[in-house]
Structures are given as structure tokens and as C-alpha cells.
């Protein structure tokens, strides 16, 4: 299915380039029409992160939704998982998050959630795409049937309480010194407050958004500042969220980064011991390290792999009854609690394990030695470099060289014009060589 607007995580691109007020208006109208089912008054909740362009896109979306008769509840800056949760809690027909996640401030995006709090499937996105470019003039509501917009003031308190309730009442964070990096993004208020209310000594960074500094040298894609602060303040743990707080990485007390694969390993082992896993396994993507698969195998658990994107992980979880899944990048999905990746909730579940075991984070969180894994990105302007004969030949040769000693994954990004080339295996030299071979071929084809 060819997509014009939607990628693997909603619609995303440069603000006032791809993501224009005109497009946001049309998305609001199209999505509003698709989700006006039944004869009740329809409503949509809209949240955003802290990008400057969020104001522009929010206003255009409001115009679009209200013009087709939908009421709008404005949440302001909140994490993506808060939008998913509040869509269900407030009985909305649709939820919208304005964010480009871990991308720089120049980008923005529009993510859509259904009334059940789950991201939309491909079929519904295709239906919306079909209406975006349609003539809306005859579909607009009459003057007496326009929607209203209202700002909701209690959003942060609701989400904080929701996050806290994912822990047993007897679990506190007393005695823990926690550094939390909010990436100058959507969780800049709720994450420190939640940790403090649970009893932690909280040191917060990345909590001064100005519209331009989201993800800039902070957050889960730039953990250096968090590592330095953990070491400087002798903290027990560091928590790095991204711009919309749907992903998380951990830094242990020694300043070592713990990625999503290790987090899934920790939780899977704990939940297996507590008989909380609904299936004997975990769902991850093709990018997760082979070391995770081997570790889980040693526990008698399987690793099911999907295409890259937390939506595909979640779709597989729902279809096959899993309650734990995620991505190496830090999207951790715990479907007992959430309908999407939730960085704060994932961090709280890890902290619960740390408190129960009463051991340093470095001893709890490094469950396996990851195999050498090399990932390189090749940017291209247009065309389909992966279809070039020279690239196909290079990929086939690289796979032959790896044989059964590793994996090679080549894929286009779903959010930017980039080809990602990843290989892993027991022999680092061989892994480097096959990645370089493919990268060189793609680079020449993309020139």
C-alpha cells in the first residue's frame, strides 16, 4: 500500500515544509469525518510536546476538527502516552499527539490514536489519507453544528496518578537518588513530580523548554549530560526520556547506558519469576540484539520479531496475547498498563525491580553481553537506492559472508530519507566489514 502522508509513526516532517497549517487543517477534517460514528456529540483530545511549531499545528488542527463538528479538548504539553490514556479516560473518539518524538525542533508530526487508546492501523490511516486531498466544501458542518474547543487544566495530575498506580501501593522509591532527563520535552513537569511523589530524591535536567531546545544535547538520544550528572551527583540511577516521553533509556550508577533490549530482559526475567507473562516470550523488532534472543532462550522464553516501529510490536502483541514488548531504542510496551510505549511507566517498573532486589542498577540491568552490532545511516535525496542492482548484489554478498554467524538488516527509515544498515555477529571485524560493504554500495547508488 503506497502512502502519501503517513509513515511508520503518523505524519512527520519539517514544520512549515511538510507539516504545514494547511495539511494539519486537512488532517483534522479528514480524521474528524472518519471518527464521527454514532449519533452522540463527538470529541477529540489534542496534546503536544514543546516545539515552537506546536502552537501553529495545534491551532490548525482545532480549526479542522471543529469545522466538521467535533469538539476539541486541548491538553497542552503532555507525553504521548498521556494522550493515549486520556483518549480512553475522557471517552473521546480520537486522540492526537503533535510531536516528532526524538527529532530536532525543526521537525514536527501528527500521531493519531483511536478511542481505545491504540495507534491507528494501516486501513484507517489509508481511509484518512483518501480524504485529506478530497474536496471538503460539501462535508463541512453547518453554522449551528460547529465544534467547540476547551483547554483541560487537570491533565498533569491525572497522568501522574495513572503512572503511580502502575506500581503496587507498598512500593516506594525511598532512598533512591534519581537523575531524570526530560529532553526539554513533553515530560518536563510530570516525570520529576511523579518520581518525587513516590519518594525519590530527584535531580532533574532537560526541564527548561523554550520551543527550540527539545532533544538538543539532552534526552534518550544524547545521554552524555545525564551520564555526567549521574556520576557527579553519585546518583543510583539516571532516566533519559525523549521529546514526547514514549521511550526511555537508563544510566546505571557507574554511568553505563542500559538500552531497551536490556530493559526488556530485566522485566521479562522478573515477570517470568512472578508468573506475570501472558505468553512465554517477548515481542521486539528486527533491530533487537541477538544477545537478547539468546538470553531469553536461556529462560525458556521466545523472542518474536516484527518490522521496526512500536506500532508493529504492539499489533503483534495484541494479535498473539503478549503483554511485554518493545524496541532497542527504548520504546517499552507493557500492555497490562498502557496502549503505547511509555517511558515513565517503563522506568517505574524497572525501579520496582531494583527496589525489590536491593541491588545496584549495574547488577540488575546488564543481563546479557550484547553481540557486536554496527548501525550506519546513509542519507539520500530521492529514488529507491535499495532497488539498484549494485546494492542488491552487495547485500547478497554481505549475507553470504556472515552466514549463520550473525544477522544483516537493511531498511529505509519510516520517518526520514535515510537507509539504515545494521549487522551483528560474534566477530566484530566481520560485522564492520559487511556493514561497510553495503554502506559503500548504497552511498554510490544514492549519489
Swiss-Prot record:
Catalytic reaction list: alpha-D-glucosamine 1-phosphate = D-glucosamine 6-phosphate
UniProt enzyme class: isomerase
InterPro entries to which the protein is assigned, alphabetical: A-D-PHexomutase_a/b/a-I (IPR005844), A-D-PHexomutase_a/b/a-I/II/III (IPR016055), A-D-PHexomutase_a/b/a-II (IPR005845), A-D-PHexomutase_a/b/a-III (IPR005846), A-D-PHexomutase_C (IPR005843), A-D-PHexomutase_C_sf (IPR036900), A-D-PHexomutase_CS (IPR016066), Alpha-D-phosphohexomutase_SF (IPR005841)
Disulphide bridges, residue numbers: none
Gene Ontology biological-process annotations: carbohydrate metabolic process; peptidoglycan biosynthetic process; UDP-N-acetylglucosamine biosynthetic process
Gene3D superfamilies: Alpha-D-Glucose-1,6-Bisphosphate, subunit A, domain 3, Alpha-D-phosphohexomutase, C-terminal domain
The protein's Enzyme Commission number: 5.4.2.10
Gene Ontology molecular-function annotations: magnesium ion binding; phosphoglucosamine mutase activity; phosphomannomutase activity
CC per GO annotation: cytosol
Active site: 101
Phosphoserine PTM positions: 101
Cofactor notes: Binds 1 Mg(2+) ion per subunit.
Residues that hold Mg(2+) according to the record: 101, 242, 244, 246
Cofactors: Mg(2+)
PTM per Swiss-Prot/TrEMBL: Activated by phosphorylation.
Pfam family, one: PGM_PMM_I
Record key words, sorted: Isomerase, Magnesium, Metal-binding, Phosphoprotein
Annotated function: Catalyzes the conversion of glucosamine-6-phosphate to glucosamine-1-phosphate.
Family label: Belongs to the phosphohexose mutase family.
Alphabetical list of PANTHER family matching this protein: PHOSPHOGLUCOMUTASE (ALPHA-D-GLUCOSE-1,6-BISPHOSPHATE-DEPENDENT), PHOSPHOHEXOSE MUTASE
HAMAP family per record: GlmM_B
The protein's name in its UniProt record: Phosphoglucosamine mutase
Organism: Methylobacterium radiotolerans (strain ATCC 27329 / DSM 1819 / JCM 2831 / NBRC 15690 / NCIMB 10815 / 0-1)
Highest classification ranks of the organism: Bacteria, Pseudomonadati, Pseudomonadota, Alphaproteobacteria, Hyphomicrobiales
